[in-house]
Curated annotation (Swiss-Prot):
Protein name in the entry: Kinesin-like protein KIN-7L
PANTHER family: CENTROMERE PROTEIN E, KINESIN HEAVY CHAIN ISOFORM X1
Domain Kinesin motor: residue ranges: 3-337
Family: Belongs to the TRAFAC class myosin-kinesin ATPase superfamily. Kinesin family. KIN-7 subfamily.
SMART domains assigned: KISc (SM00129)
Keywords: ATP-binding, Coiled coil, Microtubule, Motor protein, Nucleotide-binding
MF-aspect GO terms: ATP binding; microtubule binding; microtubule motor activity
Organism listed in the record: Oryza sativa subsp. japonica (Rice)
This protein's encoding gene: KIN7L
InterPro entries reported in the protein's UniProt record: Kinesin-like_fam, Kinesin_motor_CS, Kinesin_motor_dom, Kinesin_motor_dom_sf, P-loop_NTPase
Length: 642
């Protein structure tokens, strides 16, 4: 919230006062206004020892103050704010012939607030190098409660509308896009030529209407790639109000009388609006913005979204003391009005997202320095623990996959060894078959003939003794054939039918036969079978161990999952607690702001009460002095009588 800035300007006196003394106290008469410290005005009674009413404002200017000084003190900050996106309003209020139009428009040698503001807007916009501006101007007057466009000749009466996008606006009002201050000055000359002026007893060129010069300032970032920036749209209102009039002083009649009635009516409604806005929030009733077109158009500047400055002009002469007192009372009430000014932006989706991120970052910064730092540390620790558990879970998963591959390899090796064992058992032969095959191979000779398929030879069992003919004792006396016949029991065989056969040991024993049947390869096969069986047993044991290790890893993985879930729950709870703390902190700050506002309102009420008490005390003192003077006069009159 921001208070309206209020200043009072006394014009130079029109009576025969010395030129070197332009203060309000130089006007002569029984009552005069005195300026103290450029912030306080006091009504002095020359015949009373106690001063009268006293008023305090942000600034008080005497007749020697120039338009440039008033602009620099009161309005220049509004121009900078308007360029930055804030709405701004400056208007002059006071009785007729008190210097309002001179303050706002000025002259060729002493430009007023409007031309100074126009030039300052363009100068300030040029200083902002990172934004580009589009400026539109309009000029309107409120004459007899009718709105006229001063930039269009013979324009029809314009209505007032309101919408969520534009707020309160005048429909059909002409807006000119301008690029320089000189272009604006030409439009101002056109508007002044179409404005209503008239002559009264108090002012030769009296304003008969309220005028509002409006500048709409739009700006956007020059870097169009920065989509996060918003478009700023601000409205600057520079208002020259017509002065309040007393018919007895102005001598108005006919058209001037009608104009004066409408002027006084709109100013009275403006005073009612200011009076309502200056009251306490709980006691404030309906604010009559709609009772006048002036207050309807100025609604954003009166208790709304705008920075507002009011220049109250006053006449220092004693003849205008009551009008000046009314002006100062209006200014005192206006000083109690607060506005809520904020930057006017049109946000795109990207700009809105950027703004929300900035607000989140600001909330994080606000949380620093409070006990929420503990929660931040807890959240950070839980995040680290969760990260460690995730790394451990990944490591266990990798080990589990490695164990699974190892188990598959062992199972494959075990299957291959089992197949080898099965093949060996299927292809094994008996010892007798093995011995016969060896003997058969050894019986073959180079001159031996192939036996026919139907030829079957049988050999006597080795368990029986081999039968043979007795060897003759005297071999020398026996012929060869006779010897052969004797050896073969009288059988004589054709020698050509015989085949060469190798020699055999005669009558081998069973033990020797078994020894001759045994092969050197039989023992390594048994040893190989035993080795393979041992390998299978070892592989089975290793497979069982791997299964047990896998079960342990899966159990550890489940435990880590449960711990991870509990950490996530704790993190969510901590975040929820942090959100609650943020909400509580914001609520406490809001309550603190409300208490500060109440304290300020209470201080203002005490101040107003003190002023009213001082005023009442001054009135009582003045009444006492007058009564005492009357009594003294009566006594003197009685003594003078014979």
């Amino acid at each position: 919230m921001e208070k309206i800035s209020v200043a009072v300007r006394f014009r130079p006196p029109t009576t025969a006062a010395p030129a070197a003394d332009q203060s309000p106290s130089s006007t002569g008469g029984d009552r005069e206004w005195r300026v103290d410290d450029d912030t306080r005005i006091t009504l002095l009674h020359r015949s009373a020892p106690v001063p009268g009413a006293s008023f305090a404002f942000d600034h008080v200017f005497d007749g020697a103050a120039t338009n440039e000084r008033i602009y620099g003190v009161l309005v220049r900050s509004l121009i900078r704010a308007a360029v930055d996106g804030f709405n701004g309003t400056a208007f002059a209020y006071g009785q007729t012939s008190s210097g309002k139009t001179f303050t706002m428009n000025g002259s060729a040698d002493h430009p007023g607030i409007i031309p100074l503001a126009v030039r300052d807007v363009f100068d300030t916009a040029r200083e902002v190098s990172d934004r580009e501006f589009l400026i539109r101007v309009s000029y309107m007057e409120i004459y007899n409660e009718e709105i006229n466009d001063l930039l269009t000749l013979g324009s029809e009466k314009l209505p007032i509308h309101e919408s969520l996008e534009r707020g309160v606006y005048v429909s059909g009002l002409r807006e000119e896009i301008v690029n320089s201050a000189e272009q604006v000055f030409k439009l101002l000359e056109l508007g002044e030529a179409n404005r209503h002026f008239g002559e009264t007893n108090m002012n030769v060129r009296s304003s008969r209407s309220h005028t509002i010069f409006r500048m709409v300032i739009e700006s956007s970032a020059k870097n169009h790639m920065d989509s996060g920036d918003a478009i700023r749209v601000s409205v600057l209102n520079l208002v020259d109000l017509a002065g309040s009039e007393r018919i007895a002083k102005t001598g108005a009649g006919g058209v001037r009388l009608k104009e004066g009635k409408h002027i006084n009516k709109s100013l009275m409604i403006l005073g009612n609006v200011i009076n309502k806005l200056s009251e306490n929030g709980k006691q404030r009733g309906h604010i009559p913005y709609r009772d006048s077109k002036l207050t309807r158009i100025l609604q954003p500047a009166l208790g709304g979204n705008a920075k507002t400055s009011i220049i109250c002009t006053a006449a220092p002469e004693e003849i205008h003391v009551e009008e000046t007192r009314g002006t100062l009372q209006f200014a005192s009430r206006a000083k109690c009005v607060s506005n809520c000014a904020q930057v006017n932006e049109i946000l795109t989706d990207a700009a809105l997202l950027k703004r929300q991120k900035q607000e989140i970052e600001e909330l994080r910064k606000k949380l620093q320095g409070s006990h929420s730092e503990v929660l931040e540390q807890v959240i950070l620790k839980q995040r680290n623990d969760m990260h460690k558990s995730e790394l451990e879970r990944d490591r266990l998963a990798m080990e589990l996959d490695e164990e699974r591959r190892l188990r598959e390899t062992l199972e494959h090796r075990l299957a291959e060894q089992q197949k080898m064992l099965d093949g060996i058992s299927n292809t094994s032969i008996s010892p007798d078959q093995f011995t016969d095959s060896i003997q058969f191979e050894s019986l073959k000779t180079p001159t031996s003939k192939e036996r026919p398929a139907e030829f079957v030879a049988s050999r006597a069992n080795y368990s029986k003794d081999v039968e043979f003919s007795p060897i003759p004792e005297n071999l020398g006396t026996v012929a060869d054939e006779d010897l052969w016949m004797q050896l073969n029991k009288g059988c004589v065989t054709d020698l050509e039918m015989l085949e060469m056969t190798p020699g055999f040991k005669c009558a081998p024993s069973l033990a020797d036969d078994k020894a001759s049947v045994a092969t050197p390869d039989e023992e390594p096969i048994d040893a190989r079978c035993q080795r393979l069986e041992k390998d299978c047993t070892a592989d089975r044991q290793q497979l069982e161990d791997s299964k047990a290790w896998r079960a342990a890893l899966e159990e550890e993985r489940d435990t880590l999952k449960r711990e991870n879930s509990s950490l996530l729950d704790a993190l969510a709870k901590a975040r929820q607690d942090a959100d609650h703390l943020v909400a509580d902190r914001l609520e406490a700050l809001r309550e603190l702001d409300m208490e500060k506002s109440r304290m300020d309102e209470l201080k203002q009420e005490i101040k107003l009460f003190s002023q009213a008490f001082s005023l009442r005390q001054g009135q009582l003192t003045s009444l006492y002095t007058k009564s005492k003077a009357i009594v003294e006069n009566c006594k003197t009159s009685q003594l003078a009588l014979p």
